[in-house]
């Protein structure tokens, strides 16, 4: 056996290995799948045979169709398409390649291979994304923000993307991201980047800039546009500040001062916004549920930079970023229709797209007329509310989407809407009312911190004098600006104290950040025994009391804070029969 091995290792007189020639720029692209996606290496080989384009690497139909788009775009851009047989390899081979974002990467790989057929392995890499029109114009693609984030994690600093996606690069000031509109510009840029990489390696690792590669012959206009974009992007990045609490401006007609007769509900919304607590409001039609909840987003401060980047990535993956959108700084507010399916709310599908709960990440998911949603949809909310993420699986692959959303529910008290009203007659049978509320399971309702039972506008003035509403009687006509001030104070306190909203505190953090005074603890114990609160319900009351104290800039949880918290959790309204 050793002699046989030595014979096999002898050099053949008919084969002389060529000296390896290094290609200094590897072409990478991105396959969007779920929240993570995957980087894909694009390689091209030219060989003898009947002229054709072959593609390997588990590509879907959209990627395979890029062969014809790429061929037409190359010819219509003034380049010569190779006369040899073209083999395109997309690796890793076991990852399914999806989407039209590979067009530009494949075209540049073919053109570069046609110009330098002897090149082999590569040291440096560039991320390239874009869909090609037959004219050679480059169209926008989804997932550019996620692609740039993944490329940064793998140390790739050079990227070529469609000009329409240029705004998504603002979050990546440390990377050299070049937006292009036409295939000709992309080829000149890529040739320059490859020459820079070669010069860098020849100089022993010294980095060079775009302007130093003057011997490549790149079009001066392309170089200037790229330099201007990088400078503008750096300035835009420098102007984005992670301020403690900042609010956006909204039209005056969305002011909460316009809502009268529901003072207790307005303060409940203030506390919900300050601590990011889940809330359900139920009452007869026309009492102001939808009116108040639909403008809830005006009470929320802007996202922190870390939160904004995560939200922007999700919307980029979904293809929902409009042209020119840089970083989404306002919390998302999603209001899906009652006909939405579980897949639309939770996410999924062939490509594992994010659902409404992920699109509402770091924001609000508002389900108006919640009882009209499918039971499967309502029950599917339980796990993401607890785990603040959702795991989606498809064809042997899985992905985790963040889903830290604030849930707002609005519902009628019964099918006809008049249950509990003093001036209207409910026509529903007791069995119908019971069946109606069975749609909201106990585990789901237990995850909702604030429960508000509303009354009709005609009864509001009279009921405001009730002792049960003594906490809320002076909040009836506060403006949005006044409500924001207390929310800003509470938000700043929470960020400084624990780095997260009170609603997201776990059991250990509750013990650490929410110590109770003797009177507050005694009142909570008696209330929990009287109203049969679950362990989660007790934690909800403590977190609500912590938020009530924060809105008053209080350092300790007092008894009146706990009284208000129990009232909000028990039902702050005129109907006390639903839970």
Residue spans for each PLM region:
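Basic, amphipathic alpha-helical bundle interface domains used for macromolecular binding and assembly
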Residues: 62-67, 82, 89-99, 351-352, ...
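Polybasic, lysine-rich low-complexity intrinsically disordered segments
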Residues: 10-12, 200-201
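Cationic, low-complexity basic patches in intrinsically disordered or flexible, solvent-exposed regions
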Residues: 4
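Walker B catalytic acidic pair
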Residues: 368-369
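Peripheral, non-AAA+ core regions of ATP-driven protein-machinery
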Residues: 17-279, 287, 556-579
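P-loop NTPase nucleotide-binding/switch module
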Residues: 224-271, 306-357
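Walker A/P-loop
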Residues: 281-320
